[in-house]
Curated annotation (Swiss-Prot):
GO terms for cellular component: cytoplasm. Its cofactor is Zn(2+). The gene is galT. Zn(2+) binds at residues 53, 56, 116, 165. Its EC number is 2.7.7.12. Keywords: Carbohydrate metabolism, Galactose metabolism, Iron, Metal-binding, Nucleotidyltransferase, Transferase, Zinc. Binds 1 zinc ion per subunit. Zinc binding seems to play a structural role. Belongs to the galactose-1-phosphate uridylyltransferase type 1 family. The active site is at residue 167. GO terms for molecular function: UDP-glucose:hexose-1-phosphate uridylyltransferase activity; zinc ion binding. PANTHER family: GALACTOSE-1-PHOSPHATE URIDYLYLTRANSFERASE. This is Galactose-1-phosphate uridylyltransferase. SUPFAM superfamilies: HIT-like.
């Protein structure tokens, strides 16, 4: 006799309507022993100022240019930009196997604060508000010239961060990147088929179910999406229809700072380490269309799985077949939800 399906025990696939892909969920594998790579935990106390850091105030960058003695978030042109403003278009090819297109743009760096030691969860909500204001200013400026502006942060050496001073990046593109183009298509198709906005509908469903919500504030929710790929992946969304960061009300912007601090604090508290991740915002492009199908959201993709030293590797089947995870989204959300919103470094002894 076939056993009844149990999502915490039996392998199954979950569909991600946002990117039109499936993920294999294998919860029984979470019980397997681990004898693989153990990454060294680097938890030494960082100074608030490092004279050797290229990003600290008044220091010389690798190009020889001096940083100002900044006291709030500081933005500058990336010294090793992946995109250039004046890039000629390649010649058109008639061969369908050898196609290329023009890629113009700009790359900028945003230092979140002058303090070398403070990542987002260690900043105050007011300090994070200042970061959000700069994000919004950059979107307005760059969105006037480019159809896509990507705000993101790679936190930690495990995510390829090349400088320990807490910072993010802002890339402006003359084109829609692959992930964004896919989300644009799926959200547009959903609106045409259902007459409503996909991620607005999704927020309503998750608010009713509550089992995958990690943090909820007045205007925002952070949750482990039903279709999550990374072990403790989260999706951050406003509760109402908002297409871009620049369209947030003052109250929504302030509340975004609150939930960013709470969510990233829970991440750090999970394994009591500075939790690595890649995060970024997706929102309506600056392409002259109404983009009613779009809903602002942020993706957090952290690699850690079992501890501060054991991470998820996207290899083998994930590279050649489809994405796979062990822990269910509901189990991951339960663990994150139960964590304190007071950072482990700030707890009273």
């Amino acid at each position: 006799m076939t056993a009844l399906f149990e999502p915490t025990e039996h392998p199954h696939r979950r569909y991600n309507p946002l990117i039109d892909q499936w993920v294999l969920v294998s919860p029984h594998r979470a019980k397997r022993p681990w004898q693989g790579q153990q990454e060294k935990v680097n938890e030494e106390q960082k100074p608030s100022y490092d004279p050797t850091c290229y990003l600290c105030p008044s220091n010389k960058r690798i190009t020889g240019e001096l940083n100002p003695d900044y006291r709030k978030p500081y933005v500058f042109k990336n010294d090793f930009s992946a995109l250039l403003e004046d890039t000629p278009a390649p010649e058109k090819s008639s061969d369908p196997l050898f196609q290329s297109s023009q890629a113009r743009g700009e790359s900028r760096v945003i230092c979140f604060s002058p303090d070398h030691s403070k990542t987002l969860p260690l900043l105050t909500a007011l300090e994070i508000e200042e970061v959000i204001k700069v994000w919004q200013e950059q979107l307005r400026e760059l969105g006037a010239k480019y159809q896509w502006v990507q705000i993101f942060e790679n936190k930690g050496a495990a995510m390829g961060c090349s400088n320990p001073h807490p910072h993010g990046q802002i890339w402006a593109n003359s084109f829609l990147p692959n992930e964004v183009a896919r989300e644009d298509r799926t959200q547009r198709d959903y609106l045409l088929k259902h007459g409503s906005v996909m991620l607005v509908d999704y927020v309503k469903r998750e608010l009713a179910l509550k089992e995958r919500i990690v943090v909820e504030t007045e205007h925002w929710i952070a949750l482990v999406p039903y279709w999550a790929i990374w072990p403790f992946e989260t999706l951050l969304l406003p509760k109402t229809h908002v297409k871009r960061l620049t369209e947030l009300s003052d109250e929504q912007s302030k509340d975004l700072a609150v939930i960013l601090k709470k969510l990233t604090t829970k991440y750090d508290n999970l394994f009591e380490t500075s939790f690595p991740y890649s995060m970024g915002f997706h929102a309506a492009p600056f392409n002259g269309e109404d983009n009613e199908h779009w809903q602002l959201h942020a993706h957090f993709y952290p690699p850690l799985l079992r501890s501060a030293t054991v991470r998820k590797f996207m290899v083998g089947y994930e590279m050649l077949g489809e994405n796979q995870r062990d822990l269910t989204a509901e189990q991951a959300a339960e663990r994150l939800r139960a964590l304190s919103e007071v950072h482990y470094k700030e707890r009273t002894k």
